Amino acid sequence: MAAKLRKFLLRYYPPGIILQYERDGVMKQKPIDLLDLTPDVDVEVLLSQIIRQEPLISENRRPALRQLIHRLIDKMLEQQHHSFTLFKVLRAHILPLTNCAFNKSGDRFITGSYDRTCKVWNTFTGEEVFTLEGHKNVVYAIAFNNPYGDKIVTGSFDKTCKLWDAYTGQLYYTLKGHQTEIVCLSFNPQSTIIATGSMDNTAKLWDVETGQERATLAGHRAEIVSLGFNTGGDLIVTGSFDHDSRLWDVRTGQCVHVLSGHRGEVSSTQFNYAGTLVVSGSIDCTSRLWDVRSGRCLSVKQGHTDEVLDVAFDAAGTKMVSASADGSARLYHTLTGVCQHTLVGHEGEISKVAFNPQGTRLITASSDKTCRLWDCDTGECLQVLEGHTDEIFSCAFNYEGDFIITGSKDNTCRIWKALTASSQPAGPGGAGGGLARPTTAFSYND
């Protein structure tokens, strides 16, 4: 039976259109990624290209498709020039924080702490929703199962990982198997697998539905401190103190490539959205760009004078940034490899960096007790977020880019709100990893 297109769904970050179609009575989704979309694109040429390449879309869908493309362009053109003001100071924990993370919609976030708990917060009121208790040591690594946001996973120095209901706080499973501390973790975008990385030199894959271990990823010769899935969820990258990163096949648990070349411990790794590239940062003062298919190093980014502590791609994968203990961040154009800007101004090391969903702004968190907001086009520092009394080690934007959270060793978490943002969840959104809301949806019954 031929597939029938039933609905278009819009995804803003990164730009794309999700095709919802029916085949043999089963509803499925297929993304059309528009990662290179710009406001000056020739829309009619783009429409013809999509219709020519995608069998599900016939010529009579052109008007609906045109409207969606214009919606994406309008979203890009929205002014992102607002500054941020302090909204709430949360005396979050009695002991220092370890990490903080938003859910996809941005209405809730979580904080982990040395006090052995994880707390869930309402972003728009600053109130604690509930506390996740049960770990016997530091809660270090935490995450929502975005884009769904209905589960939370916590990784602890007690060697276990716990899976929780994000709405009720109910404990689903305690995942046991690591021999030492768990320091990094992630859900796959499909929310079916959890990956955990440990100081025992291994990573493990766990089944979300059953809580059972699916595989142990063994091969690193030192601690695993970074990991992440690609968008398709079929590959995982791990970064280790053994100077290497590794690519693994999630289905088999086998190592696909060893990414060797750094001359010091790997501190951070990440896939681009398309899943074609991996960036790694190292204490050897460099970051490296790797080809996923071949495992080959495409380029070595030099220029920092001290350890690279964090690396990141923007949502579309067109920009890449490295943050360093030298107090600077370096912003690159991914395709050309050119360093567009060196972001200088912090008086201490930068341990965390994050793009806003639009890829127009960047925040850096520093030991100088401040966060800085940067313009990605000009490299200009737009704002210094001041008020913390100790090192800031965590920072994040929500999905709409109008709220920022910062976590500090002063035991507080601060919520910063864009001056144009309402205190309610921001308007329509879509979601970036395969789940999209029908903000503009066209349905077909033929």
UniProtKB/Swiss-Prot annotation:
The keyword Cell membrane does not apply. Keywords: Cell projection, Cilium, Cytoplasm, Cytoskeleton, Flagellum, Repeat, WD repeat. One of its GO terms (biological process) is outer dynein arm assembly. GO terms for cellular component: ciliary basal body; cilium; cytoplasm; motile cilium. SMART domains: WD40 (SM00320). It is found in: Cytoplasm, Cytoskeleton, Flagellum basal body; Cytoplasm, Cytoskeleton, Flagellum axoneme. Gene3D superfamilies: YVTN repeat-like/Quinoprotein amine dehydrogenase. It comes from the Eukaryota. WD repeats lie at residues 92-131, 134-174, 177-216, 219-260, 262-300, 303-342, 345-386, 388-426. The keyword Cell cycle does not apply. Residues 423-446 are annotated as: Disordered. Functions as a cargo-specific adapter between intraflagellar transport (IFT) particles and outer row dynein. Required for efficient dynein-mediated transport into the flagellar compartment. Interacts with IFT46 and FLA10. This is Dynein assembly factor with WD repeat domains 1. It comes from Chlamydomonas reinhardtii.
